[in-house]
Amino acid sequence: MELKATPRKSQEKLAPGMIPAVAYNKEKNVTFAIERKAFDRAFRQQGTTGLFDIVIEGGETFPALVKAVQMDKRRREAIHADFYMVTYGEPVEVSVPVHTTGKSQGEIQGGLVDVVVHSLNVIAPGPRRIPQEITVDVTNLNIGDHVTAGQIKLPEGVKLAVEPDLVVLSVLPPRLSAEELEAQAQAAQVAGMVASGELSEAAAEAVLEGSASLDAVKAGEEGSRAQQETEEASERADQGQ
């Protein structure tokens, strides 16, 4: 996509509607100005993987990729753009967005596909062969499954620029509601109390079934133990007479 620009010296005042920009590589950098609206439209369409032909008025023309965009947070518009100059036919490393397709078996079971890496660094054989996105089919994934960078099929000639064992996405189990989390915590607490002898198995069953509250059962158990201790003390006293 062609993007027209005007030459600009550093700190030079900008014409209305223009934003400063710089393009660079290992050998040189060029400063210029571009129309904000034209850049916004082009960047929404091309992103960081789309190739731009920067045409500087009265100067050179070169291919480049968007490296970074500084935004005005309040107005939500670009205020500065960085481009990286590339050379046709030479490999180039880029960050490509990761998208999923299909509905996983895990999602059907109530789970969730968690995309951990939203953009994957790859090396394309040339600027014109940069993939616009990387698509991962999650249809056959079950809860607990994950996909690593090395398992993703890339376009011909495109190579990974990250470790192949990098986890890109995984399928998580269903999220528990607040009530389910509370019930889970109570079950663990009750199990611990049974193990320590604080609750009888019958009392624990009543709590877990919802027929009695834990506080009520604890009070009842404590009362029973106190009564038993009193009876035992009385029995010992009778035997001592």
UniProtKB/Swiss-Prot annotation:
GO cellular component entries: cytosolic large ribosomal subunit
Gene Ontology MF terms in the entry: 5S rRNA binding; structural constituent of ribosome
Key words of the record: Ribonucleoprotein, Ribosomal protein, RNA-binding, rRNA-binding
Segments of this protein annotated with the region Disordered: 214-241
One Pfam family matching this protein: Ribosomal_TL5_C
GO biological process: translation
InterPro entries from the UniProt entry: Rbsml_bL25/Gln-tRNA_synth_N, Ribosomal_bL25/Gln-tRNA_synth, Ribosomal_bL25_b-dom, Ribosomal_bL25_C, Ribosomal_bL25_long, Ribosomal_L25_dom, Ribosomal_uL5_bac-type
Function statement: This is one of the proteins that binds to the 5S RNA in the ribosome where it forms part of the central protuberance.
Family classification: Belongs to the bacterial ribosomal protein bL25 family. CTC subfamily.
PANTHER family: RIBOSOMAL PROTEIN L25/GLN-TRNA SYNTHETASE, ANTI-CODON-BINDING DOMAIN-CONTAINING PROTEIN, RIBOSOMAL PROTEIN L25_GLN-TRNA SYNTHETASE, ANTI-CODON-BINDING DOMAIN-CONTAINING PROTEIN
Description of how the protein assembles with itself and partners: Part of the 50S ribosomal subunit; part of the 5S rRNA/L5/L18/L25 subcomplex. Contacts the 5S rRNA. Binds to the 5S rRNA independently of L5 and L18.
Name of the protein in question: Large ribosomal subunit protein bL25
Protein species of origin: Deinococcus geothermalis (strain DSM 11300 / CIP 105573 / AG-3a)
